[in-house]
């Protein structure tokens, strides 16, 4: 929201931005990112705007403990206060953005990292036949694959485009694809991950026949990444 103010002959405006801020700290060793700290909370940032220049004049955060909820309800507009209280609503997307920036900063070889995460997941339980059992046994590795976001999608697309992903790796990649891109999930039964992806890829091409890339980027971001790879 914007609030006009006057200071002598200079026209100014105060703009208040309501949002959810995340800060994460990483260390980097042996080619891998390690999360070592961070914070995640609602914030209100106030900018003073004059002559197209934005200056931060206030950075508000709620107090801890029993004041937390009441501070948010007092500060945030009624129509968005519930979103401010639900810290999980945007958390995965925000963590993915933090990971993306850390990857770029440290120049992480994401293909090698993601390959190792899948290798660890496939290692046990060796007697299981249900892919979900492997995910349950390696929830931390699977969560890490989720956090790598677009890099995991790039890996998945490359592997499926190579073909013959008919084993456990293909099934795990299919599940991860659906979790990373729920907006593009297919309602069909497929014997293998490769069979599922082949239909998924056909669907992406059909979407391209109906919409331009700008629309796809906004509404089907995973398909947008895939279509860029095959153009």
What annotation goes with each model-predicted range?
Residues 1-2, 85:
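Short glycine-rich, low-complexity/disordered patches
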Residues 2-65, 137-167:
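Mature extracytoplasmic domains of secretory-pathway proteins
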Residues 30, 92-104, 195-197, 207-214:
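Hydrophobic transmembrane alpha-helix bundles
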Residues 47, 78-80, 177:
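Extended, hydrophobic interaction surfaces within ordered domains
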Residues 57-109:
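Low-complexity, intrinsically disordered terminal/linker segments enriched in charged
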Residues 109-231:
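Extended repeat-based scaffolds of very large eukaryotic assembly and lipid-transport proteins
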């Amino acid at each position: 929201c914007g609030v006009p103010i006057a200071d002598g002959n200079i026209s100014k405006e105060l703009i208040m931005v309501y949002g959810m801020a995340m800060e994460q700290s990483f260390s980097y060793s042996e080619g891998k990112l390690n999360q070592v700290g961070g914070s995640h909370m609602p914030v209100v940032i106030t900018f003073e705007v004059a002559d197209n220049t934005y200056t931060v004049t206030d950075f508000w955060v709620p107090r801890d403990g029993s004041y937390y909820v009441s501070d948010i309800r007092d500060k945030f507009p009624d129509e968005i206060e519930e979103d401010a209280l639900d810290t999980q609503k945007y958390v995965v997307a925000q963590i993915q953005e933090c990971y993306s920036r850390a990857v770029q900063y440290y120049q992480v070889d994401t293909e090698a990292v993601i390959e190792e995460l899948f290798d660890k997941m496939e290692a046990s339980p060796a007697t299981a036949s249900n892919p979900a059992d492997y995910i349950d046994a390696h929830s931390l590795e699977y969560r890490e694959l989720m956090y790598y976001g677009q890099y995991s999608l790039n890996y998945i697309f490359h592997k499926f485009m190579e073909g013959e992903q008919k084993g456990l790796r293909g099934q795990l990649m299919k599940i991860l694809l659906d979790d990373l891109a729920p907006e593009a999930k297919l309602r069909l039964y497929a014997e293998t991950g490769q069979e599922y992806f082949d239909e998924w890829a056909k669907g992406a091409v059909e979407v391209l026949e109906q919409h331009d890339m700008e629309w796809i980027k906004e509404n089907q971001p995973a398909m947008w990444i895939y279509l860029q790879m095959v153009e």
